[in-house]
């Protein structure tokens, strides 16, 4: 009887851990080195097209100034969406979640994300980390 209880408890704990791991589905999509001069063609191409509901941006090294961002979806019409992003991200700072792919009926997968911006207050290139949540 004791072994049956132990097995049942172990299975219950395993299921709780499994579900907890699935609930936090954040993935590092990529990192972009930001040049010191304003550039409008910085692209993060996703090698595997994936459905991404929202993203976070983080400045890992140096301060960033951003002037725009767009998400491109794999679709027959090459659909895209402009993102509302903060104009500055300080080193070590992470943005709130930025919602994308709001069309719940037609789950489109993201093929690339483009950024316009540059490094500020640093002689080194800052890095922009993009985290996705599906």
Curated annotation (Swiss-Prot):
Signal peptide positions (record): 1-23
Entry keyword set: Signal
**InterPro entries (alphabetical):** UPF0412_YaaI
Q: Is the Zinc keyword given for this protein?
A: no
Q: Which family does it belong to?
A: Belongs to the UPF0412 family.
User: In its UniProt entry, what is this protein called?
Assistant: UPF0412 protein YaaI
């Amino acid at each position: 009887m004791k072994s049956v209880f132990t097995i049942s408890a172990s299975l219950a704990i395993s299921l709780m851990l499994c579900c907890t791991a699935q609930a936090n589905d954040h993935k590092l999509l990529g990192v972009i080195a930001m040049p010191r001069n304003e550039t409008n063609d910085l692209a993060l191409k996703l090698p595997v097209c994936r459905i991404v509901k929202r993203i976070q941006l983080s400045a890992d090294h140096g301060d960033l100034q951003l002037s725009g961002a767009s998400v491109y979806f794999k679709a027959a019409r090459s659909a895209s969406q402009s993102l509302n992003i903060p104009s500055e991200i300080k080193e070590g700072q992470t943005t709130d979640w930025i919602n994308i792919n709001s069309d719940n009926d037609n789950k489109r997968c993201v093929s690339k994300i483009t950024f316009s911006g540059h490094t500020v207050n640093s002689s080194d290139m800052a890095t922009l980390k993009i985290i996705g949540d599906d």
